[in-house]
């Protein structure tokens, strides 16, 4: 894909040392989570090849940017870059397990902080619960997506909505409890298999979530 800037990450991403970090803890109601971004965040997809999974990330970014335009906010997700490599599945699983277990949020892991891009999207072959988390003071976020060969990401329409959902956390939204909406999640009983459908489509946001985004990123939001 010509639109994706190809950047090679040196020093072997597969050798990155696992470190614990806690994602934004899910909330039971819709609305804004952490502090808003102070700039348009660039995105780096970490994966082995410029393939179908990268295309899904680009489509999810385009979905969010269309939505921002529709609700009248100047905020956008920035350009999508590509880094050939991987973050070890055991590292991502350890972070995912900590997210579910709760605990205090540590500083951003050095290996994530040093990666290109403000939002790092890790497409993994591992089996863990996908997650999205932010470190607002560092203007950094990590979105980790489990293998699309494992249930439920192997179901039609699920992976694209999981990617969009986790990007929603990186943008600043929490979970809600409506299984017909994109941001439904724990502690509500809805799970990613609720996204399954024969035709590709992105699930919508609640009106309250759209209002929260407009409050986080108003007309005068300073895009720097």
Task: Describe the predicted segments one by one.
Residues 2-16:
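N-terminal secretory signal peptides and thylakoid transit peptides that target proteins
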Residues 17-21:
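Hydrophobic membrane-targeting alpha-helices
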Residues 51-170, 174:
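Metzincin-family zinc-dependent endopeptidase catalytic domain
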Residues 27-63:
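Fold-level signature of zinc-dependent metallopeptidase catalytic domains
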Residues 139-153, 157-158, 174-224:
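Metalloprotease/metallohydrolase-associated module, dominated by Zn2+-dependent proteases
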Residues 41, 73, 178-179:
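Residue-level signal for beta-strand positions within conserved beta-sheet cores that form or flank
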């Amino acid at each position: 894909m010509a639109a994706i800037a190809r950047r090679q990450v040196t020093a072997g991403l597969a050798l990155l040392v696992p470190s614990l970090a806690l994602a934004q803890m899910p909330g039971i109601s819709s609305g804004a989570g952490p502090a808003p971004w102070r700039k348009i965040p660039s995105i780096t997809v970490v994966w082995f090849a410029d393939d179908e999974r990268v295309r899904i990330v680009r489509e999810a970014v385009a979905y969010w940017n269309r939505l921002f335009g529709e609700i009248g906010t100047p905020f956008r997700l920035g350009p999508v870059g590509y880094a050939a490599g991987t973050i070890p599945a055991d590292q991502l699983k350890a972070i995912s397990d900590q997210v579910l277990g709760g605990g205090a949020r540590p500083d951003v892991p050095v290996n994530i902080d040093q990666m290109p891009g403000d939002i790092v999207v890790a497409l993994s072959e591992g089996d863990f619960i996908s997650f999205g988390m932010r470190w607002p003071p560092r203007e950094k976020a990590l979105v980790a997506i489990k293998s699309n060969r494992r249930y439920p990401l192997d179901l039609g329409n699920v992976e694209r909505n999981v990617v969009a959902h986790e990007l929603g956390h990186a943008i600043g939204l929490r979970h809600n409890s409506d299984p017909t909406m994109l941001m439904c999640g724990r502690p509500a009983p809805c799970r990613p298999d609720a996204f399954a459908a024969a035709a590709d489509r992105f699930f919508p946001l609640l009106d309250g979530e759209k209002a929260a985004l407009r409050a986080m990123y108003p007309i005068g939001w300073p895009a720097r």
